């Protein structure tokens, strides 16, 4: 590298995004982070700061509002060598081949190393199992989508760049299907759709909330069972905003049991994390083009809670 903080261009990837005619005047960093699920907003901001983004041929600021019809050019640098450590952490591998891997992530496991979590993450475990995984730099995480630390369930991993592009395209086109199970307080209608924009909570920037100027977000749910004051839901994401299911269900008035951020302060159920599990994942295989489906049963801690509720109901 030619200097500290700079990115050496070896085999850079060029991308072009045309702002759609219906797009509102949103900040360019937020717009690009939403348009490209494989890049976080912080990564987009870094690209902008280092001159790897052009807006109608000029270098923008991160706060630049986008306009319909504008052309945005991005240069995605190659992976940055990191100090990531491969750790032989056991993984529940639901499926693997030369192109993808599907992992059943346990609750409590962080997906990416971050300040405070340099070890013991899913990425550390993946590097031990797949030494050739294209995951080396922060701009190429290799992981197509994320789950919160205390959400369990299915994640798909791209084992090379071609698979990554295919899976990201499926996410952007909303062809990838993700279904969760959530236990909530209250009894919602049997089916419903929550169509409400999500953004940073203006009262607490560490939380997300339904806000008028947020990014479009849509969640579908179906009632599976009821246990007194509690309901088990099947939840399907149409979009993938941060904390979307947790925020939307709280907004609807049915917070997730055990959610330390968006749930009730007290619960009579002894659960150390939110009752949210990614139970189903459907996608088109990047190489074969065939539709594949994967499932993961509820983990033991969530099954215990359901049995407790079933036992209570049988006594009344």
Swiss-Prot record:
The active site is at 148. Its EC number is 5.4.99.-. Keywords: Isomerase, RNA-binding. One of its GO terms (molecular function) is RNA binding. It comes from the Bacteria. Signal peptide: none annotated. It catalyses: a uridine in RNA = a pseudouridine in RNA. One of its GO terms (biological process) is enzyme-directed rRNA pseudouridine synthesis. Residues 26-98 form the S4 RNA-binding domain. It holds the Pfam family PseudoU_synth_2. Belongs to the pseudouridine synthase RluA family. This is Uncharacterized RNA pseudouridine synthase Caur_0901. The lineage of its organism: Bacteria, Bacillati, Chloroflexota, Chloroflexia, Chloroflexales.
């Amino acid at each position: 590298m030619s200097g500290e903080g700079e990115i050496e261009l070896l085999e850079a990837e060029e991308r072009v995004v045309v702002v759609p005619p219906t797009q509102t005047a949103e900040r360019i960093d937020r717009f690009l982070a939403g348009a490209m699920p494989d890049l976080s907003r912080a990564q987009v901001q870094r690209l902008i700061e280092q001159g790897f983004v052009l807006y109608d041929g000029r270098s923008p600021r991160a706060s630049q509002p986008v306009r319909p019809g504008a052309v945005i050019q991005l240069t995605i640098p190659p992976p940055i060598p990191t100090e990531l450590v491969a750790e032989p952490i056991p993984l529940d591998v639901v499926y693997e081949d030369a192109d993808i891997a599907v992992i059943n992530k346990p609750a409590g496991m962080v997906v990416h190393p971050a300040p405070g979590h340099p070890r013991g993450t899913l990425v550390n475990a993946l590097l031990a199992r797949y030494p050739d995984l294209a995951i080396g730099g922060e701009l190429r995480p290799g992981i197509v989508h994320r789950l919160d630390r205390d959400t369990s369930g299915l994640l798909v991993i791209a084992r090379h760049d071609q698979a990554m592009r295919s899976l990201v395209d499926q996410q952007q086109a909303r062809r990838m299907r993700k279904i969760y199970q959530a236990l909530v307080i209250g009894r919602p209608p049997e089916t419903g759709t929550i169509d409400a924009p999500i953004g940073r909570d203006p009262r607490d920037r560490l939380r997300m909330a339904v806000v008028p100027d947020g990014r479009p977000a849509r969640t579908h749910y179906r009632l599976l069972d009821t246990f007194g004051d509690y309901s088990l839901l099947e939840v399907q994401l149409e979009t993938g905003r941060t904390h979307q299911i947790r925020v939307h269900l709280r907004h609807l008035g049915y917070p997730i049991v055990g959610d330390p951020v968006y749930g009730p302060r007290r619960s009579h159920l002894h659960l150390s994390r939110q009752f949210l599990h990614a139970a189903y994942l459907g996608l088109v295989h990047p190489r074969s083009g065939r539709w594949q489906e994967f499932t993961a049963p509820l983990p033991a801690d969530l099954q215990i809670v359901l049995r407790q509720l079933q036992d209570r109901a049988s006594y009344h």
